[in-house]
Swiss-Prot record:
This is Ribosomal RNA large subunit methyltransferase H. Keywords: Cytoplasm, Methyltransferase, rRNA processing, S-adenosyl-L-methionine, Transferase. One of its GO terms (molecular function) is rRNA (pseudouridine-N3-)-methyltransferase activity. Its EC number is 2.1.1.177. It comes from Lachnospira eligens (strain ATCC 27750 / DSM 3376 / VPI C15-48 / C15-B4). Its main location: cytoplasm. S-adenosyl-L-methionine binds at residues 76, 108, 127-132.
């Protein structure tokens, strides 16, 4: 299985980078992991709704160009479906059983995801109704994917 994480924005803090590196290393036993970092647009303070929408659309174009045609796309969105860790594991497992070999998770920038990206998504996943920094969300997502594989393999980790 190939797992791709498409993210808007770069990680600047060393502790986030270390966590991403650790979970990437752990996941290498279970899947081929690719992390695609896309540049984010500068968001002016007090930007109008129109400007914010333009920024989301520019970022959205970059996201869509990074998604392979055969990918099953899972967009992280507040309005998505919340799953527990076992349900996420079952979802990934079922996709593999059904013949999906490429899952792409998408993490948007500070303004969220463009409508075009949400339309391209095969599934919308929410981790919470709260908003998280995209750097932290990347770590949380990778940890949950790692946990999902451990659950699938009946290996100790998940409690």
């Amino acid at each position: 299985m190939r797992i791709t994480v498409v993210c808007v924005g770069k990680i600047k803090e060393k502790f986030y980078t270390q966590a991403v590196d650790e979970y990437s290393k752990r996941l290498s036993r279970y899947c081929k992991l690719d992390i695609v970092e896309l540049p984010d647009e500068k968001t002016p303070d007090n930007a109008s709704d129109v400007v914010n929408e333009q920024i989301k659309n520019k970022e959205g174009e970059r996201i869509l160009s990074a998604i392979k045609d055969d990918a099953y796309v899972c967009a992280l969105a507040i309005e998505g479906k919340m799953l527990d860790s076992v349900e996420l594991s079952e979802k990934i497992d079922r996709l593999g059983i059904d013949g999906t070999s490429n899952i792409t998770f998408v993490i948007g920038g500070s303004l969220g995801l463009a409508d075009a990206v949400l339309k391209r998504a095969d599934y919308k996943l929410s981790f919470s109704k709260m908003t998280f920094p995209h750097q932290l969300m990347r770590v949380i997502l990778l940890e949950q994917i790692y946990r999902a594989y451990r659950i699938m393999k009946n290996e100790p980790y998940h409690k």
